[in-house]
Design a protein with these regions (language model features):
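N-terminal pre-Walker A segment at the start of P-loop NTPase domains
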Residues: 1-22
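Phosphate-binding P-loop
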Residues: 22-30
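Short hydrophobic/aromatic beta-strand immediately N-terminal to the Walker A/P-loop
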Residues: 32-34
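P-loop (Walker A) phosphate-binding loop of NTP-binding proteins
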Residues: 36-38
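Conserved lysine of the Walker
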Residues: 43
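Short beta-strand-centered segment that lines the nucleotide-binding/catalytic pocket of NTP-utilizing
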Residues: 56-72
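Switch II (G3) loop of P-loop NTPases
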Residues: 80-87
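Short phosphate-coordinating micro-motif centered on Lys-Gly-acidic
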Residues: 90, 95-153
Length: 153
């Protein structure tokens, strides 16, 4: 696990740009990213940055009330999920995350710490308020994002 410091929205957006660039290079049919942290820690801001910098030109809405927003970019589909308002462990099953698709599937789960049944992830980012910015722990489960981590060393 690696720790970095994000001082402001600009540095958080830069992390989103780096992740979106790496996502384009990874040759996997499904990539899952888990985002954890308190309210206002930067989870949704980072998810918006990743999706926008991957080619989505429209509004990236927070899925806090809808639970899931889908973004079809033609060859890639993003499933942006927010578990903040979920109470039941089975709530995650309604999204059918493991469904087969001809598109590359990129799953971003906010409040992943609320998952009752742990799912495999490729990247987990945990936000923590620190001074005027954020301390961020990055867990690259299978080293697909090692270049991202090296950028901050």
């Amino acid at each position: 696990m690696n720790k970095i410091y994000l001082e402001n929205d600009e540095s958080t957006n830069k992390l989103g740009v780096l992740i979106s660039e790496r996502l384009k290079e990874i040759n996997k049919s499904t990539i899952e990213i888990h985002l954890e942290g308190d309210l206002g820690a930067g989870k949704t801001f980072l998810a918006r940055s990743i999706i926008s910098n991957s080619g989505w030109s429209g509004l990236v809405k927070s899925p806090t009330y809808t639970l899931c927003e889908e973004y079809d970019l033609g060859d890639v589909i993003f499933l942006h999920i927010d578990l903040y308002r979920t109470d039941e462990p089975e709530d995650i099953h309604i999204f059918d995350l493991d469904r087969k698709t001809h598109l590359k599937k990129l799953i971003i789960i906010e409040w992943a710490q609320k998952l009752a049944i742990k799912r495999n992830f490729h990247l987990k980012i945990s936000f923590e308020h620190f001074e005027d910015g954020r301390k961020v722990l990055i867990n690259d489960n299978d080293e697909l994002f090692s270049s991202l981590i090296k950028h901050y060393e």
